[in-house]
Amino acid sequence: MHRAMKLGTLREVLGCLLQRGLIDVGMIGGAQSDRYANINSTLIGRPNAIRRRLPGSGGANDMASHCPRLIVITHHERRRFPERCDYITSPGFLDGPGGRERAGLRKEFTVTVITDLAVMENDPETCALRILKVMPGVTIDAVRAETGFRPEVAPGVTEVDPPAPEDLRVLRDELDPARVYLKEEETLPTSRR
């Protein structure tokens, strides 16, 4: 809240701003994301056979339900991209075209999933995630090998432009000097490329 007179509570942000439609973009993470960009951050397994409990929504459901644009950031591993999430914490397109409308959620909705292998976005017609860009040195086959469903490929897939040296300096020296999120040099094992 730039130049805010007061710092809002989570309740004020979610209830007064988000649910009134005053926030355009939400950013979330999760343990699983499926073909239709549904996000699971609640449990691994089935409700009657839970293998692992996770933190839960923490406001992510509100963002996925009310923001017209959602950005999901996660590592790209096959177990994180199943055909269907074990549990839907935050709705993407639920069961495909028309799923959001049937559930009473906003129709105008776009999801972008950014991983260490690719950038995926929902196809406007099928609502399924499709590969939009790949990270430098990563192939479409490598992305598909680490995905539990077969994502389509958008026309004209290109590599993500590497960050400029000044952008890296700002990220590493000003935003994350303790290297909580960024490592000095992040590289992928060659088996994942």
Predicted regions and their residues:
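Conserved phosphate- and dinucleotide-binding cores of soluble alpha/beta proteins
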Residues: 1-159, 163
